[in-house]
């Protein structure tokens, strides 16, 4: 596996916990987006970007500066996958919508973005983070479906590992 890092934005700790789980399974480092700089980006070939979702489907606040860093460092030649944390019961119309902003930023910065997971098996009404019948990354709901998190992470990692 090429140099890989997990970068996350988390306000309540759920997305941080997921990021640390993913990083542990890959044997890589997880870093809070509030602590990244251009060197963090340029020194890794693969970036796994995670955000919790807030408001009307926005990414976690620290990501707004993080996106500026992604763009200034540039992502040409890098592989990106994203994961999002949401609450499909309380916010069924914006489930994991923050992933869309990360996806758009990665594409704009020149990254090769890996496909996401199927929407099958998820309960929600709508999300900006969907393309066809797939999420733009791995969608997780630690509030209502935490019993599915481990299985979803493992399946996603199996899907993306060949590209990392």
Regions found by a protein language model. Give the residues of each.
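FMN-binding flavodoxin-like domain, especially the glycine-rich phosphate-binding loop
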Residues: 14, 25, 29, 43-47, ...
């Amino acid at each position: 596996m090429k140099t890989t890092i997990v970068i996350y934005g988390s306000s309540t700790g759920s997305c941080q916990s997921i990021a640390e789980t993913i990083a542990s399974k890959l044997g890589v480092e997880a870093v809070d987006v509030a602590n990244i700089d251009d060197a963090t980006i340029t020194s890794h070939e693969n970036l796994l970007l995670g955000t919790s979702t807030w408001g009307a489907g926005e990414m976690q606040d620290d990501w707004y500066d993080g996106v500026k860093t992604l763009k200034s460092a540039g992502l040409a030649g890098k592989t990106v996958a994203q994961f999002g944390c949401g609450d499909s019961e309380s916010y069924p119309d914006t489930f994991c919508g923050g992933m869309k902003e990360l996806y758009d930023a990665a594409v704009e910065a020149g990254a090769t973005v890996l496909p996401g997971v199927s929407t099958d098996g998820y309960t929600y009404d709508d999300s900006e983070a969907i393309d066809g019948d797939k999420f733009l990354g791995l969608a997780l709901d630690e509030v209502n479906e935490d019993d599915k998190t481990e299985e979803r992470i493992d399946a996603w990692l199996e899907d993306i590992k060949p590209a990392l």
